[in-house]
Amino acid sequence: GLARFGLEYETVAAGNPGVVYASISGFGSGPKGAVLPGYDLIVQAMSGLMSLTGERDGEPYRAGISVFDVMAGLHATIGVLSALNARHTNGRGQHVEVNLLSSALSGLVNQSSAYVAGGVVPFRMGNSHPSLFPYEPLPCADGELIITAGNSGQFRKLVEVLGVPELADDPRFVRNEDRTANREELRPLLVDRLRTRPKMEWFRDIIAAGVPCGPINTVDGGVAFAEEVGLEPVVHVGEGTSAVPSVRNPIRFSETPPDYRLPPPSLDEHGEDIRRWLAAPADPQATDEERSA
């Protein structure tokens, strides 16, 4: 680790007690966890996430992105900002530690809490929700539409749009717990109606009725929809022909918006500068500005 270079927290803090020092590991800094390599996929497996992802009778699946790498980075950022805020009060820095496994268990939210608080070990349910229905993708004439009627009011609006308003007063489906218990009876009744029209037609009508829903997009469809609703998801960094399209920072600031100035460097763009800097003899009296020059 960094101790080989004299850069572990204790050494750095001895020279600068106000330093805020962040560390991210796979399984913590304890003697048992520190020796384990931390890769996102391994943590998806060992945290239990993969046991929750996939069809009930199928194999466990990983998430489509390195979700816990991202989450741990966000947790570290929150920790650093909290430590900086504390330093304004007490003048002291501190060591902020984050590990992938703890971030993962936190990110499992209701699933990990169900086990910790009640001993309930959750299981895979495909795209179904354990305690809500309809709350999953349902097939239309040309593809699937996610419908999340999370309460009885929304369910009533949904079946009215679908042309089967009598289902809202059917004793099997009146309450959410009834709909969940009888989902295998309710699903084909909804699907029979949904299959009569394309998903985007249903999307427009169901949304207009106040029921949350959405089509399952590919990534290009996700970007296109963000553009359609005015989120401006793509920003061009740089100028002219060297400008590089990138995904926009998701955080909007009313007073201090991000400044997208420098595009990613081209291959070896700064190579000569770096090689010259590495070859130069170190001057302990040089300022940071002189060293960077």
Label each PLM-derived region with a short phrase.
Residues 207-229:
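Conserved PLP cofactor-binding pocket of PLP-dependent enzymes
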Residues 115-122, 225-239:
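Short, surface-exposed loop/helix-turn segments at secondary-structure junctions
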Residues 133-209, 213:
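Aromatic-enriched alpha-helical interface/lid elements that frame and gate functional surfaces
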Residues 84-88, 162, 278-279:
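Short, hydrophobic alpha-helical segments
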Residues 3-145, 149-150:
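Active-site-adjacent "lid/gating" segments in soluble enzymes
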Residues 237-293:
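Flexible, small-/acidic-enriched active-site or ligand-binding loops
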Residues 76-83, 111, 157-161, 189, ...:
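Alpha-helical scaffold segments in soluble metabolic enzymes
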